Amino acid sequence: MERITVTLGERSYPITIAAGLFNEPASFLPLKSGDQVMLVTNETLAPLYLDKVRGVLQRAGVNVDSVILPDGERYKSLTVLDTVFTALLKKPHGRDTTLVALGGGVIGDLTGFAAASYQRGVRFIQVPTTLLSQVDSSVGGKTAVNHPLGKNMIGAFYQPASVVVDLDCLKTLPARELASGLAEVIKYGIILDADFFTWLEGNLDALLRLDGPAMAYCIRRCCELKAEVVAADEREAGLRALLNLGHTFGHAIEAEMGYGNWLHGEAVAAGMVMAACTSERLGQFSSADTQRIIALLRRAGLPVNGPREMSAQAYLPHMLRDKKVLAGELRLVLPLAIGKSEVRGGVSHEVVLSAIADCQQA
């Protein structure tokens, strides 16, 4: 069992990583006998895990209700959020309730925002079931729902009480979802840890076949890196923005193509290549390192080009709604070398559009 602490003073919390955690009531601390819980999951995961998690909590004396939501990025919306509020109010659940997010990034983000908003804030626990949510979205307290004009535009910073990562969940993960998660894994190597990127080049095949020790190390290292960044910059005033490598481009793809048509990790993968190409054009990133990124993404089964039906010009309106934009100026996370990156403003639209166009045609 691995345990990592996200250090935020009185709001610090543990990330527990191991196989078989759904069998142990102690995995779901700080829950205790007599507590009231609303388990939030989706219709795909409910048949796989709902009874198991509900059962282990009930054996610990926890009172459990549940709400099952439709599955997919398009349902990360205010309308579906209201479904959670309605379920909480009908019981009713008070301020002493705990929301448990049992699912991937959509469930985690939506449930976290529900917890931040319901009666001005209740406790919640992240139980991520996808690789992407285990290494990224469940850690750090970013919660949100989408708006038709932009991804994650309505949300709050709100930290969980704990994160429970059961490695056994990956056994039921479709190959496309596994690849999507690997995009965020690769991101950490590009922006923060050159040694980890090199390790990924040597161990990607083991991750693709769900080798236990390799996957445990991979998730632990990603969570360590994320925890360090969040502890230093919880509200994304500086360092934490680096975690958005590829996301400004990727969110544009998701919004333009329709939420769910491109998985988040797929869009981020293409976006990271666009960011690398932009940095190349500015003379601050090598072509050789761009090719290393492209090669690793391809081995993971991820796209390295944007959708052909989306013109370069179609990106800009979405990118200019990005949360990093200041005074109307586009700010991008750009790699400087494998393991090193920066947030840069003042990049001309012409340079960005040229990089996008080349990535569309490559």
Swiss-Prot record:
It comes from the Bacteria. Catalyzes the conversion of 3-deoxy-D-arabino-heptulosonate 7-phosphate (DAHP) to dehydroquinate (DHQ). GO terms for biological process: amino acid biosynthetic process; aromatic amino acid family biosynthetic process; chorismate biosynthetic process. Keywords: Amino-acid biosynthesis, Aromatic amino acid biosynthesis, Cobalt, Cytoplasm, Lyase, Metal-binding, NAD, Nucleotide-binding, Zinc. Belongs to the sugar phosphate cyclases superfamily. Dehydroquinate synthase family. One of its GO terms (molecular function) is 3-dehydroquinate synthase activity. It catalyses: 7-phospho-2-dehydro-3-deoxy-D-arabino-heptonate = 3-dehydroquinate + phosphate. PANTHER family: 3-DEHYDROQUINATE SYNTHASE, 3-DEHYDROQUINATE SYNTHASE, CHLOROPLASTIC. NAD(+) binds at residues 71-76, 105-109, 129-130, 142, 151, 169-172. GO terms for cellular component: cytoplasm. CDD domains: DHQS. InterPro entries: Dehydroquinate_synthase (IPR050071), DHQ_synth_AroB (IPR016037), DHQ_synth_fam (IPR030963), DHQS/DOIS_N (IPR030960), DHQS_C (IPR056179). Its main location: cytoplasm. Binds 1 divalent metal cation per subunit. Can use either Co(2+) or Zn(2+). It comes from Salmonella arizonae (strain ATCC BAA-731 / CDC346-86 / RSK2980). Pathway: Metabolic intermediate biosynthesis; chorismate biosynthesis; chorismate from D-erythrose 4-phosphate and phosphoenolpyruvate: step 2/7. Zn(2+) binds at residues 184, 247, 264. SUPFAM superfamilies: Dehydroquinate synthase-like (SSF56796). Its cofactor is Co(2+); Zn(2+); NAD(+). This is 3-dehydroquinate synthase. Its EC number is 4.2.3.4.
